[in-house]
């Protein structure tokens, strides 16, 4: 007896077109172009989930560097001083402090300057 695939192909195509929802033109309507676009979108999503971590770390470092230099210290000396003083604040928190609470950040900078 011949085996037919039945609903499987339709289910696969429907899944791809569901993922392609919101794309413009044929990229959300035509299966072949939608499949290519979805593949590319998933590749970019995978890559950029990792890239996002690098981008945010670079942003935090730039903000900390700006805050440290306003208080007369370079970024590397600031981080070295914090390590020596056993201050366990990560770069995300330090960057937030540099923006939202400059007075507190200045105190931390003076603590790091004593150790550096």
UniProtKB/Swiss-Prot annotation:
Keywords: Ribonucleoprotein, Ribosomal protein, RNA-binding, rRNA-binding. SUPFAM superfamilies: Ribosomal protein L20 (SSF74731). GO terms for molecular function: rRNA binding; structural constituent of ribosome. Belongs to the bacterial ribosomal protein bL20 family. Binds directly to 23S ribosomal RNA and is necessary for the in vitro assembly process of the 50S ribosomal subunit. It is not involved in the protein synthesizing functions of that subunit. HAMAP family: Ribosomal_bL20. This is Large ribosomal subunit protein bL20. It comes from Desulfatibacillum aliphaticivorans.
